[in-house]
Amino acid sequence: MIQVTRLNGTVFTLNALYIEKVETFPDTTITLTTGTKYVVLDTAEAVHSRIIEFYQAVQLLSNPHIRGEEHEE
């Protein structure tokens, strides 16, 4: 889960596994795989960082092939 802030200042969490895309229109808009959209105060870069941190925490990026590495060390 990642924490984000709505435009009205309300903080909530999203399951990062359901995030399909993050766009800036200029407000940051997060679209889920369900089609639900959230407009948040957080920058797209901050959301991307939180998504990566979440993936690392659940070891989703622990496979070197998923990370783009060709040879496992």
Regions found by a protein language model. Give the residues of each.
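Eukaryotic intrinsically disordered, low-complexity regulatory linkers and tails enriched in Ser/Thr/Pro
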Residues: M1-T13, L17-E73
